[in-house]
From Swiss-Prot:
It comes from Phoneutria nigriventer (Brazilian armed spider). The modification Phenylalanine amide is found at F10. The modification Pyrrolidone carboxylic acid is found at Q1. Expressed by the venom gland. The lineage of its organism: Eukaryota, Metazoa, Ecdysozoa, Arthropoda, Chelicerata. This is Tachykinin-like peptide-VII. It is found in: Secreted. Keywords: Amidation, Pyrrolidone carboxylic acid, Secreted. It comes from the Eukaryota. Belongs to the tachykinin family. Its main location: secreted. One of its GO terms (cellular component) is extracellular region.
Length: 10
């Protein structure tokens, strides 16, 4: 999911 990818930045 795109959201999960974004969370990876954190």
């Amino acid at each position: 999911q795109k959201k999960d990818r974004f969370l990876g930045l954190f």
